[in-house]
């Protein structure tokens, strides 16, 4: 987890990272991940003695490198961004992946959807409408989700069908996100969005299961994750 000093690019004593590696999960496993786990807070439980107590009012900052590659194929062209968001937001249906990265993946899927561009018809597969994007960079996220687990440089790939109203097709996503331990300043993740595609940011974020609020400064903060999406 990056400190606020690192986010703002302030110098300080460098600390050696103690984060441990986490192997990617076996994607062939059939166990359902559709539940909301909650960590115990009783200090007598295993592994809890040094765990940070979750405080929903405590603002934290996470700094990271990210890459998102997205391809969306639909049976017909999307008319509005709302149509795009309704389709792409189904990317994590029956999610099996690194649980600690899921909130960040939701943000990357939201980000990618705002930057989608139509593939020229002559290049599309059998003339089927196709959209693509490739975004990468460094960013930080202000949030109130408590202490986050270590994030290593391990790409994960997701392929999901969607069938929303008049639209049906497939979503292909490859996402990578990992901790940035540098002292260099980074922009907020929201700065990478193409905000010209929509004006109701809070409403569109909720379509991806992201509950966001504005700070007094006007900056968006990720408050929590909706378990209904």
Swiss-Prot record:
**Consequence when changing residue 4 to A:** No effect on host NEDD4 or TSG101 binding
**What spans are recorded as compositionally biased (Low complexity)?**
1-10
Annotated segments matching region Disordered: 1-23
* MF terms (GO), sorted A to Z: structural constituent of virion
Q: Which domain of life is it from?
A: Viruses
Mode of membrane association: Peripheral membrane protein
Q: In chain numbering, where does the motif PTAP/PSAP motif fall?
A: 37-40
Q: What is the effect of changing residue 51 to R?
A: Complete loss of mRNA nuclear export inhibition. Loss of ability to inhibit host transcription
Q: Which GO CC terms are listed, alphabetically? A: host cell cytoplasm; host cell nuclear membrane; membrane; viral envelope
Q: What applied role does this protein play in biotech?
A: VSV is used as an oncolytic agent for cancer therapy, because of his wide host range, rapid replication and mild pathogenicity in humans. VSV used are mutated at M51R in their matrix protein. These mutated viruses cannot successfully infect normal cells, being unable to counteract the antiviral state induced by interferon-alpha in normal cells. Cancer cells are impeded with responsiveness to interferon, and then can be successfully infected and lysed by the virus.
Per the UniProt entry, the effect of residue 160 to A is: Loss of host GTF2H5 binding. Loss of ability to inhibit host transcription
**In the UniProt record, does the keyword Phosphoprotein occur?**
yes
This protein's UniProt keywords:
Apoptosis, Eukaryotic host gene expression shutoff by virus, Host cytoplasm, Host gene expression shutoff by virus, Host membrane, Host mRNA suppression by virus, Host nucleus, Host-virus interaction, Inhibition of host mRNA nuclear export by virus, Membrane, Phosphoprotein, Viral budding, Viral budding via the host ESCRT complexes, Viral matrix protein, Viral release from host cell, Virion
Described by its record, this protein's role is as follows: Forms a double layer around the helical nucleocapsid, the inner matrix layer binding to the N helix and the outer matrix layer binding to the envelope glycoprotein. Plays a major role in assembly and budding of virion, by recruiting cellular partners of the ESCRT complexes that play a key role in releasing the budding particle from the host membrane. Condensates the ribonucleocapsid core during virus assembly.
Homology family: Belongs to the vesiculoviruses matrix protein family.
- For this entry, the protein name equals Matrix protein
> To which species is this protein native?
Vesicular stomatitis Indiana virus (strain San Juan) (VSIV)
Output the lineage of the source organism: Viruses, Riboviria, Orthornavirae, Negarnaviricota, Haploviricotina
By which gene is this protein encoded? M
């Amino acid at each position: 987890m990056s400190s606020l000093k690192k986010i703002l690019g302030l110098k300080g004593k460098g600390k050696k990272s103690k984060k441990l590696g986490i192997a990617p999960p076996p994607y062939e496993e059939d166990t359902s991940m559709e539940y909301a786990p909650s960590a115990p807070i009783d200090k007598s439980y295993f592994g809890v003695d040094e765990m940070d107590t979750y405080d929903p009012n405590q603002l934290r900052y996470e700094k990271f490198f990210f890459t998102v590659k997205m391809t969306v194929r639909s049976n017909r062209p999307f008319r509005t961004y709302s149509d795009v968001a309704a389709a792409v937001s189904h990317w994590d249906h029956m999610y099996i992946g690194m649980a600690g990265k899921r909130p960040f993946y939701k943000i990357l899927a939201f980000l990618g959807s705002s930057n989608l561009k139509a593939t020229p018809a002559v290049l599309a597969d059998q003339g089927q409408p196709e959209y693509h994007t490739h975004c990468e960079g460094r960013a930080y996220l202000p949030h109130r989700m408590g202490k986050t687990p270590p994030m290593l440089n391990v790409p994960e790939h997701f392929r999901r069908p969607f069938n929303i109203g008049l639209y049906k097709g497939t979503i292909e996503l490859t996402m990578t996100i990992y901790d940035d331990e540098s002292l260099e300043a980074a922009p907020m993740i929201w700065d990478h969005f193409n905000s010209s595609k929509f004006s109701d940011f809070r409403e569109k974020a909720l379509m991806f299961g992201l509950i966001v609020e504005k700070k007094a400064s006007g900056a968006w903060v990720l408050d929590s994750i909706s378990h209904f999406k």
